[in-house]
Amino acid sequence: MASCRAWNLRVLVAVVCGLLTGIILGLGIWRIVIRIQRGKSTSSSSTPTEFCRNGGTWENGRCICTEEWKGLRCTIANFCENSTYMGFTFARIPVGRYGPSLQTCGKDTPNAGNPMAVRLCSLSLYGEIELQKVTIGNCNENLETLEKQVKDVTAPLNNISSEVQILTSDANKLTAENITSATRVVGQIFNTSRNASPEAKKVAIVTVSQLLDASEDAFQRVAATANDDALTTLIEQMETYSLSLGNQSVVEPNIAIQSANFSSENAVGPSNVRFSVQKGASSSLVSSSTFIHTNVDGLNPDAQTELQVLLNMTKNYTKTCGFVVYQNDKLFQSKTFTAKSDFSQKIISSKTDENEQDQSASVDMVFSPKYNQKEFQLYSYACVYWNLSAKDWDTYGCQKDKGTDGFLRCRCNHTTNFAVLMTFKKDYQYPKSLDILSNVGCALSVTGLALTVIFQIVTRKVRKTSVTWVLVNLCISMLIFNLLFVFGIENSNKNLQTSDGDINNIDFDNNDIPRTDTINIPNPMCTAIAALLHYFLLVTFTWNALSAAQLYYLLIRTMKPLPRHFILFISLIGWGVPAIVVAITVGVIYSQNGNNPQWELDYRQEKICWLAIPEPNGVIKSPLLWSFIVPVTIILISNVVMFITISIKVLWKNNQNLTSTKKVSSMKKIVSTLSVAVVFGITWILAYLMLVNDDSIRIVFSYIFCLFNTTQGLQIFILYTVRTKVFQSEASKVLMLLSSIGRRKSLPSVTRPRLRVKMYNFLRSLPTLHERFRLLETSPSTEEITLSESDNAKESI
C-alpha cells in the first residue's frame, strides 16, 4: 500500500513538472513571436511622450504633427469634420486635401469601387477651415478610358483633368497601371501644344500631388514595366509649366511650383534668385513654407530652412525662372540608388528660359537633412541631378561645398532637377560591456570546465569511457563558447561611433552616387564570431541532448554495454549536426542576399556579434527562429521529459535496502538530481521567463538566468569533479603535502610524536547511530575498525 502511494506521488510530481515545463516553454515561444511582431523598441526620448499629442512625434527638438493637427503640441485641429452634402458622405478631410466620398461606383460600372465624388477642405482668406463644393465624377469613366480620350485633340481637357483628379483621390488603391495611365493623361494636359486652361493645369497639379501618395512599390513597377517615357515626360512638362505662372505659386501637399519674372529694366549684369523651403509642423508642403527672393547677394539659410536654392544667371538673357519642389522622389526611379529608410527625399527643380546664346546659369544649394536622429547618423552625401536621357541620377557638373553651419552644400554648373542623396549609419545603441556578475560567472565556469576536462582525461582509465567522453565533449563545447562570449560578443564597430550631425568627417572630394541610403560598416570578424557562437552553443545543447539519451539508455533501458560504435555515432551527431545547421543558415542567407554588401546583417546583429533579430514582418525568415530557437526548444522539451523520467524511476525511487539515514539519502537524491539537471541544460528554461513585459520581474529573472547559466561550468566542476573520490583523495594528498611543508618551515626544531589512529564504527540494528573513536599510539600507521552488535569487530581500510 505504501509503495502504491509513493508511486502515485511520483507520477503526480512528474505530471505537475511536465505541465509547468510545457506551460513555460509555450508561453516563452508565444512571447517571442509577439515581441518580434511588435518590432524592436525604440530608444526613449528625453521629452515626455505625452508632450506631442494626437499622434505627433518628437523629432529634432520639435513636434512633427500628422496632417490633421498642427501647433506646438499638435493640439490645433487642421481638418474638416465628417460632412454630408448632396447625398454624399465624407469622412474627416485634412486641410489642403480632397476627400473621397464614402459612396462608390457600382460593380457593373467601369469605375467600380472608386469614389463617386470628392470634396476639398481648405483655408479661407481669414484662416478659417471650410469645405468647398462637391465635385461629382462619372462612374462610366476610368483612367484607361480617359487615357484614350486625351489623345483626341478636341477632347475637353477640363473635364478630363477633373475626372483624373477624382479617380486618383484614394492613393491607397492606386496600382501601377493606374499610375501609368494618370501620368500619361496629366502629361498631355501640361503639353503646351494642347493649350489647356490654367484651371485644368491646376487640377492636374492636384493629381500629381495625389499620385505621390501612392506606394513606392507601385512606382517601382511603373518604372519596370512602362514601355514609354511617361514619368520622364511628366517631369519635363512640370519644368516647363514652372515658367508659366508669372510671379504666382501653386502649392499642394506633395508638390510646390513657383515662378519669377524679370522686367526689361536694368537688364545688364548678373541676377541671383533665391528660392527657400521652410520646415513645417508636418511633412506636407503648405503655401506659407515657400519663398522666393530676387536680386539677392547669396544664400541666407536660418534655423527654419529645410532647403534653399540660389540661381545665378545672366539677366539680359533671362526673363523667367521657375522652381518645382517634390515632397519625395517617387517620380525619379533610380537604377543605381535604392532608398530603404522611410524618410522623404525632397527633389528641387530649377529652370530658366535662357536661349542657346547663354547657358551660364549655375545653382548653389543648401540642404538641412531631415531624418530621425534617434535612429540614424549622417554618414555621407552626394550632389546629383536627374539625367533625363539616362533616366537616372548623375553627378556631372556637380560638386560638394564645405560649410560650418550644419547644412549640406552643393554647387552645379547647370539647371535641372537636383537632389542630395544622403547615406546614413544606423545609430545603434551598443550595449555596455559585460557586468561583474557575467564576468565573474564566466571566469569561474571557464576555470571549472578546464579543470574538469583535465581531470576527466587524466583519470579516464578508472572511468567508463562512454560517460567520460560525453562529459568531456560537453565541457569542451561550453568552454569554447564561454571564451568566445567573453572576448568576442562585443562588436568592434562600437569604437567607431561619431557624434550626431557631425559633417566634418564627410569626404567632400568624393561625390560618387551611393547604392543605398543606409550603410553599415562591414565587420567580417564579428560575423565569424557570431557563426562560431551559434555553432558552439548548438553543440552544447546537442551534447546536453546526447547526455540525456545516454543516461536514458543506461538507467532506464539498462543497455550495458552500449551499442557498438556508440561513441563514434554520438560524436558525429554532437559535432556534425550543428555544423550542418550553421552552414545551411549562412549559405541560404548569402545566396539570397549575396549581391548586397551588407548581407551579413541578415545573419547577425550590429549591436552584438550574435544572430539577427528579425524585422516585424520577417519572423518566418528569421535565422534566429529556425536555426536556434526551434532546435533548442525541441532539445529542452525532450531533455525535460527524460529528466522527469529518470528522476522518478531512478533517482527518487524508494530503496528498501538503504542503510543510511533518511537525511543523508534525501541529500544524495537532491545532489544527484541537480547533477542530472546541469548536464541536461534544464536551467536554460529560465530564458523563456525573461520575456515577460513587467520590467521588475524581467530583471529578477535575468539575474537568476545569468547566475545559473554563467556558472554552469562551475556547477559541472563541483558536481562531477569535486564530489568524486579520486579527486577528493588527490586533493587531500596535495593539502596534506602543503600542510606538512608549511609546518616544517614554521617548526623546524620541534620533535613531533608518532601517532597511530584507530577508528571504530558501531553499526547498530537501527542505522541512526554512527559513532567514531580515535586512539593515540606511537605507531605511524592508521587503521579503521567497524563494529556492530551482532558481529565481531572487522577491520577495514
From Swiss-Prot:
Domain of life: Eukaryota
Keywords: Disulfide bond, G-protein coupled receptor, Glycoprotein, Membrane, Receptor, Signal, Transducer, Transmembrane, Transmembrane helix
Signal peptide per UniProt: 1-26
Stretch list, region GPS: 383-428
Disulfide cross-links: C383-C410, C398-C412
Subcellular location: Membrane
Parts of the chain on the Cytoplasmic side: 460-468, 550-565, 645-669, 720-797
Keyword Cell wall biogenesis/degradation belongs to the record: no
Domain GAIN-B: 275-428
Record protein name field: Adhesion G-protein coupled receptor G7
